[in-house]
Amino acid sequence: MGDKPREKAPRGRAREELCAALVRVVARSGLDGVTYRSVAKEAGLSHGAASYHFATRDEMIQEALLWASRHSIQASRISADGDLEGLAADLPQLMTDYPEEAMFSFELVLASVRRPELASDIRASYYDFIDAVRRSLAKAGFGDNLELARVVFATVDGLSIQHLIYRDRRATEEGVRMLQALLRLALDAVERGEKLS
């Protein structure tokens, strides 16, 4: 971030930079801090860049939510190749490297309780995460188990919140290992023909 806007970025790249900047603005100042001007300044772009790429503030927030969700799913390897050891293994590092994305997401979750117009976007974002977990668990041998995917995602989401509060990487790592151990036990039960519910 600089004080002077830099040269014009390509259209797709500028939108991504604005989304990433919006995430940082929300992490630092909350949703009330989001304006075309604040986001453009954070991105190092001219004020007009934000209004050019996004018709409204809400559209800019919605696009940033989609961007952050895609980035988090890719970076977290949550839809890994079915290896339970890999499931959420990167969470402690991600929370260290990208705490702003988690802060942004949780800020929007809380705001959606007060602002119903955000709720459908939050639900869609959560569904994307749950679906990625569901696919990963299916590859691991659990079959198509949406209920288990919801519980696993809720656990990862909770570990993320706790990491933001306590800033204790070791505790987050232990939480991930415990989740993986519980999933191994559950998979053993499934392989023996037992039902999880």
Give residue ranges: language-model regions.
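Amphipathic alpha-helical segments used for helix-helix packing
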Residues: 96-126
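Helix-turn-helix
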Residues: 14-17, 21-59, 63
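Solvent-exposed, amphipathic alpha-helical segments
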Residues: 17, 21-29, 75, 104, ...
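Hydrophobic alpha-helical connector segments
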Residues: 63, 74-102, 149-152, 176
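Hydrophobic/aromatic-rich alpha-helical bundle segments in the mid-to-C-terminal region
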Residues: 118-119, 123, 138-197
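Short, basic, alpha-helical segments at the C-terminal edge of helix-turn-helix-like DNA-binding modules
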Residues: 66-71
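N-terminal intrinsically disordered/low-complexity leader segments
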Residues: 1-13, 191-197
